[in-house]
Amino acid sequence: MKPSTLILFCLAAIMPQTFHAQSTGKKVVAYVTSWTSVTPDPFVMTHINYAFGGVGSDGVSVYADGTSRMQQLVRLKNRNPNLKVLLSIGGWGRGNFSPMAGNETKRKTFAQACRAFCDRYNLDGIDIDWEFPGNNSSGETSPSNEKQNYTLLMRDLR
């Protein structure tokens, strides 16, 4: 089977499920990165998570890689008002979450910064991509209360 035929076959297999997901209330989420120029069809998914953003060097602010790219994705909501666009903060080995989450004042300030960032860029929310609370994959020691701090951060973000 030719590669192009295989790709068409795979697309044909998943497309009805994708459209069905939108009509049944299921969520179809796509991560779209700052470093690609691909613009997704806003009717194929229910949510776009823009990858990536992070916790600022001050430990409480929010930033996004390539805000112009992010705004391009937000404009897709003009074509499909039901589409939700979120900023994914963190990612593999990234985030600076632990010091912020372990401090109540910083946590609350960060939550306010997330809200302000969403308002400023017309985002529908934030995706926290913290890998992995209490089990740092980089080999560094994680604080013993990191899982609890993660829970507190989620509470404050709500």
What function would you assign to each model-found segment?
Residues M1-Q22:
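Bacterial Sec-dependent N-terminal signal peptides
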